Amino acid sequence: MPRMFGTDGVRGLANRDLTAQLALDLGDAAVRVLGDDGGRETNRHRALIGRDTRVSGDFLSHALAAGMSAGGFDVIDAGIIPTPGVAFLTSVLNVEMGAVISASHNPMPDNGIKFFARGGFKLPDTKEDEIEAVLGQDWERPTGAGVGRVSHDTTTATNLYIDHLVSAIAPEGNEQPLKGLKVVADCANGATSVVAPEALRRAGADVIVINASPDGYNINKNAGSTHPESMQAMVRASGADLGVAFDGDADRCLAADAEGNMVNGDQIMGILARAKKREGKLNHDTLVVTVMSNLGLKLALKEMGIDTVQTNVGDRYVLEEMLRGDYSLGGEQSGHVINREFATTGDGTLTALTLCNEVVKSGKSLKELAADFPQLPQQLINVPNVDKMAAKTNKAVLEAVAREEELLGDTGRVLLRPSGTEPLVRVMAEAATQEQADEVTARLAQIVADELAL
């Protein structure tokens, strides 16, 4: 039986896969697993809930809070707030757990629930397995004064988070480091529709806001980091210095330069890593990336005296490696960037602020900064209906990969990744030219299809 928890919590079609009953049961199970006595100033257990702008978030947040409060937790409902805002508040308010109701960049009908432990860190697999193990089980729940209360305080929670974000680039509290910078902010009609524009304005930027009118149904719809075209067009039309685009729960950010050219997560990480090294804040002069990061980033950073450490795909694995090796910066090509100086998870709004700050500090345009991190030409082919697990053991496939890697040398690479949810293998190649990347990928994809066919 597959795990209920995926790589980023529990997700599914709201009211079909993810029902009110399941949300209640998850809240009930989570209090049993995550409740502790450490760090509490009173004898009450506390949890915090936040959500994105999906209409289904209403009933799911009520159900989740019901499960938690029935289990004896006082619940603070922070309302609509970015996922990293919940992580921050879980830490700063010293509550025992935080929970986010969001399906991130997925379409509106989907939703999800994920948890943060005390301190604002995502749960390890072992804790998720414990929650799943007790899900729906009966237990001796509290009665009388032992049951929890639910309070609603969106304004205080949001302002605490915005203050924290701005302080990352304006530590004195009254500076306006982004004064004179014109920025387009595409909020994906999602959780940062209030937070990102306000944080950028407080930092002094001239902000043009688009896709920040959530109605419960338009989250991620032709907007945000998965559909940045409207942001790119607005940058060109308005003469802005740059644009930033977030996803539905604002844990990721992509950017565009003044000409509307996209700047991806790899380039953003490169820019921020170099800035941190200059300031003496890049621990061990190392950036943590995933296997999907472009080889061009690694080669450019090497020239700058910056090493890279590679993990599997997923910001949770990036964070695990950052904690293990005491690294200060890491992330993914998709725009998840974790800046451990200020956050315990990927934070799109923080990424936007620090990127804008580096544009101002450097005196260079975003186009100039991004040009220092050229991306090698890349090709990706999904090969369906194959035995995906055999991709790592099949002799013919492994020999073919070795041949291609030898041909590419130091200016290219090959990656075979089994899908986590489908019977397919992703075949990716990077090379000095697009033609070479296309040819390598085509040859390998054919061998994978022939050798691993179901």
Curated annotation (Swiss-Prot):
Keyword Hydrolase tagged: no
What terms describe the molecular function in GO for this protein? magnesium ion binding; phosphoglucosamine mutase activity; phosphomannomutase activity
Record bears the keyword Isomerase: yes
Question: What domain of life is recorded for the organism?
Answer: Bacteria
Q: Name one GO cellular component term.
A: cytosol
EC identifiers of the protein: 5.4.2.10
So where's the catalytic machinery, residue-wise?
A: S104 (phosphoserine intermediate)
| This protein's UniProt keywords | Isomerase, Magnesium, Metal-binding, Phosphoprotein
Q: Name one Pfam family in it.
A: PGM_PMM_IV
List modified residues, type Phosphoserine.
S104
The record ties this protein, via InterPro entries, to: A-D-PHexomutase_a/b/a-I (IPR005844), A-D-PHexomutase_a/b/a-I/II/III (IPR016055), A-D-PHexomutase_a/b/a-II (IPR005845), A-D-PHexomutase_a/b/a-III (IPR005846), A-D-PHexomutase_C (IPR005843), A-D-PHexomutase_C_sf (IPR036900), Alpha-D-phosphohexomutase_SF (IPR005841), GlmM_bact (IPR006352)
The known PTMs are summarized as:
Activated by phosphorylation.
Name the chemical reaction catalysed here. Answer: alpha-D-glucosamine 1-phosphate = D-glucosamine 6-phosphate
Return one Gene Ontology term, BP aspect: peptidoglycan biosynthetic process
What does the record note about the cofactor? Binds 1 Mg(2+) ion per subunit.
List of residues binding Mg(2+): S104, D247, D249, D251
Q: What does this protein do?
A: Catalyzes the conversion of glucosamine-6-phosphate to glucosamine-1-phosphate.
The family database entries (NCBIfam families) matched by this protein are listed as: glmM
What HAMAP family does its record include? GlmM_B (MF_01554_B)
Q: What is this protein called?
A: Phosphoglucosamine mutase
Query: Which species does this protein come from?
Result: Bifidobacterium animalis subsp. lactis (strain AD011)
Q: Which gene encodes it?
A: glmM
